[in-house]
Amino acid sequence: FCEKMTTFAVGMSLSSIIKSSGVRNFTKLLSANVVAQVIGLVVYPILTRIYAPEDFGLLNLFLSIGNVLIVLSIADYYYALVLPKHEKDAVALTHLSLLLLLLTTVLVAVSVLFSEQISILFKSPKLSWYYWLMPFYVLLVGGWNILNYWYIRNKAFGRISGYQISQSMLLAGGKIGMGYAGALQGGMIYTAVVAPLLSLLTSVA
């Protein structure tokens, strides 16, 4: 009898753990991340048939520059959004992060005037063709980074999961669509900017 009661208690304990909000939220985020990764892996062989290696190189350079600018602009303040006990402190950090992001976006927009020189610096002449998209990329992806941690603070994990999946689907579909439409040189870069915009709009809707 005692053994049965112990087994029952353990079963109830495991059930309560599984049903706990923390585990559910973790599972939700993990599932979304796995789905997003699988989508990327599935479409990659298709993309390699559409785009040339230099197209992937140009995309990686564009994303690398943009991501470094985002890190420099927000200075990791958005990581701290989950820490304050008082809502007003979190709001103040959010405003500071957004202000820094906007200032950086303006500076990046000004740097578009020197896109030719920047492309020479990185030894990638074609970068100048698409560098005008950089301010939009910095603003959109940087804005999501801030919003992401705001969602974490408010336990809006469903919105984070939705963004991850929609982002992956839009990136995959957009790259394939742009490729078949003939936008081979910049198709993936255009998609890298448009997909975050649409995903961001979806997450706040």
Residue spans for each PLM region:
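N-terminal membrane topogenesis motif
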Residues: 1-39, 79-82, 92-94, 98, ...
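Interhelical loop/hinge segments that connect adjacent transmembrane helices in multipass membrane
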Residues: 5-22, 158, 185-189, 201-205
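Short membrane-interface helical motifs at transmembrane helix boundaries
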Residues: 6, 106-124
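Signature of the first transmembrane helix
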Residues: 18-75, 103-112, 168-172, 196
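Helix-loop interface residues and adjacent transmembrane-helix termini in multi-pass membrane transporters
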Residues: 50-53, 124, 154, 181-182
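Hydrophobic alpha-helical transmembrane segments
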Residues: 61, 128-135, 161-205
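Helix-loop junctions and terminal segments of transmembrane helices
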Residues: 71-89, 152-153
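Cytoplasmic helix-loop-helix junction between adjacent transmembrane helices
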Residues: 144-164
